[in-house]
Every structure is written in C-alpha cells, then in structure tokens.
C-alpha cells in the first residue's frame, strides 16, 4: 500500500515557499499519495491512518499561535506517523524558541542549503537535518525560439547587439537591504566611471526611480518567466549582492543560463559554486544583522566588499571567454545537483527513511 503524506503549505499566499512546496508535492506524487493541506487551519484537521506530515514552512504560523492553537497542533501530532518540517535560514542563527519547536515537534528538518543546515545545528537543532536543494526550472533549458517574449525584452536585445555594450543583471523584487540594493547602486555608479560601455538590467517590483543616475533598463512589475529566461541570456553577468538568504536562486539561474554570477564569500549560495569558479565569490567586509525585528532569523549575514567587487567585475568582463569556458566545463555539476530530477531524488531519499 502506498504511504500517504499530508503536505501542509500556505496555499493562499503567492510567495517563494508556496512554489517550492508545489514542486515538492509534484515530486512526491511520483511515489506517494499526497494531500495538500492549507496552512491556515491545518492543525484542526484529524489525520486518518497515521500519514506522514510535512509542514512547509514549519514556523510560518507558529509565531502567532497561542495556547489553543498549540493544543490543537499537539493533537494533530499524535495522529501522524512522522512529522517533518521544511525551513530555511536567512541568517546564521535561529531563535531558541523556534529551535525548540523543531526539536519538540518534528522527527527531522528538511533544509535547503549547507548554510541553513549549519545555522540550525549551530542554533541547537537536535533532530536530523536533511539537505534538499531548491531546483531550477526546466524552462531555463528551453531553446531561444521556444520563448514567448515581450517587445520590451526584444528591444533591449536588439539595442545591445547594435551598440555592443555590456549588460549586468540584478533582481531586486523585494527586501532591498537583504538583497543589497544599496551595495549594487554604489558598485554600479563606480563601474560607470571606469567604463562607458556598461549598462544595467534591473528587475524590480516597482519602478526604481532611485537608480536614475544609472544607464539602466528597468523591468518592473509582473513579467513572464520566459522574459526572465531571456533577461539572463542577453546579460553578460549577474550581480548577487545579497547580505542574507538561504539559497538565492538567481545565482544558480545565471549559471544555468551560462553567464557568470558574482556573489559574496560565506553565503548560502556557495553550494552552487564549483571549485574553479569560487574566485567569483567576493570577500565579505562585514557581518551585519539582517532583520533587527525578526523573531525567527536573529543572526547575521555577509556584506560584499565594494572595491573588490568592482575589480572582479572588470576582470571578468576583460577575460569573458575564460569564464564562459569554465561555466561550460561545470555544466553537468549544476544539472546533477540542482535539476528537478536531482532534487526529486534528494527529497525521495529523505522520505524513504520515514515511509517504512
């Protein structure tokens, strides 16, 4: 008989962990019966026949629960054969109260990077921690002629070919401080002083009027993933200035799109940097607190050294063919570790430990 899984996730809220959860559900359905349970009221369910339950993210609702909600949850816990939490670490430390929730209520934690595993363990996690990466979307592998593109993206591509300028891409959809928007702005202004052939492609939620001193194309608001795929492909380099975060998919997407990604040494993204591309990791000059008011992610992150970043960007642009060759050389590394099938294998291996 197939084992049943109750997969709990926030179906009402279009955020990154909803989409990761939906990918996990799709993967698990290849081997298990999976029921999708809404986060907002899951603790009031009475599971039948003792399924495995996965709660993604584990802490999503707990920060505002009171005694009544926890009493319901404790009953829920007695009705499942195993409970696994899925979480991330956006800083290098998790608050003690939430580590206690993980230790007291779960049989194990599924975490998305070595950084997240270390943050949880160093914060006192006692239950097993399993590393299951985020996967990149297969659409990144599509042929150019398969992409359905907006005129704005095609115009940027056409202009770049005509003017022969360099294009540096960054995504600043939300969380400006964590994403390092201020660091990007300083680096960009200095690069423009060094070379007159560098332009910037900024994807953002709202118009970036604060970047009007840059030679910039600003794609703001919702856009299709096909457009995003093309934005990577017409760019020469992706600049990942994030101070924190548990994985930062943009850097991986850049490598899959066969362009170099520059990031800061010591962050969660190091998992997808193979040895001969680690020189693209810039030294960190500080370890700032990322979320002063966050009750869960209470630790620090990294901060890119601006001068060293500028020097490295110029070096990469001057030796571009060399870096492109290294990316080609390592392409199987990303496919074997971060593709849909690779991550599905990681997830199913975890589930096998609890399904017998």
Curated annotation (Swiss-Prot):
Domain of life: Viruses
Name of the protein described by the UniProt record: Uncharacterized protein 356
């Amino acid at each position: 008989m197939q084992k049943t899984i109750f997969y709990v996730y926030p179906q009402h809220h279009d955020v990154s962990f909803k989409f990761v959860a939906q990918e996990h559900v799709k993967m698990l359905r290849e081997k298990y019966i999976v029921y999708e349970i809404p986060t907002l009221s899951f603790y009031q369910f009475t599971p039948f026949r003792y399924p495995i339950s996965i709660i993604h993210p584990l802490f999503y609702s707990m920060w505002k629960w009171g005694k009544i909600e926890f009493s319901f949850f404790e009953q829920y816990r007695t009705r499942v054969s195993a409970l696994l939490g899925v979480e991330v670490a956006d800083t290098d430390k998790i608050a003690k109260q939430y580590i206690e929730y993980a230790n007291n209520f779960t049989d194990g934690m599924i975490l998305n990077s070595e950084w997240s595993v270390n943050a949880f363990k160093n914060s006192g996690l006692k239950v097993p921690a399993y590393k299951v990466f985020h996967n990149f979307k297969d659409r990144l592998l599509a042929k150019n002629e398969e992409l359905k593109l907006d005129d704005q993206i095609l115009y940027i591509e056409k202009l770049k070919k005509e003017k022969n300028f360099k294009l540096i891409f960054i995504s600043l959809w939300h969380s400006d401080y964590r994403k390092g928007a201020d660091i990007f702005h300083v680096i960009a202004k200095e690069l423009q002083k060094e070379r007159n052939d560098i332009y910037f492609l900024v994807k953002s939620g709202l118009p970036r009027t604060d970047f009007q001193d840059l030679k910039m194309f600003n794609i703001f608001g919702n856009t299709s993933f096909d457009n995003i795929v093309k934005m990577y492909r017409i760019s020469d380099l992706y600049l990942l200035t994030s101070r924190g975060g548990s994985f930062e998919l943009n850097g991986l997407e850049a490598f899959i799109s066969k362009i170099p990604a520059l990031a800061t040494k010591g962050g969660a993204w190091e998992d997808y940097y193979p040895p001969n591309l680690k020189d693209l990791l810039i030294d960190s000059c500080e370890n700032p607190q990322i979320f002063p008011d966050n009750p869960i992610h209470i630790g620090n992150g990294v901060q890119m050294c601006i001068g060293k970043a500028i020097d490295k960007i110029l070096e990469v642009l001057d030796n571009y063919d060399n870096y492109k060759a290294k990316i080609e050389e390592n392409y199987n590394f990303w496919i074997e570790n971060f593709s849909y099938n690779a991550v599905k294998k990681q997830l199913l291996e975890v589930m096998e430990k609890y399904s017998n």
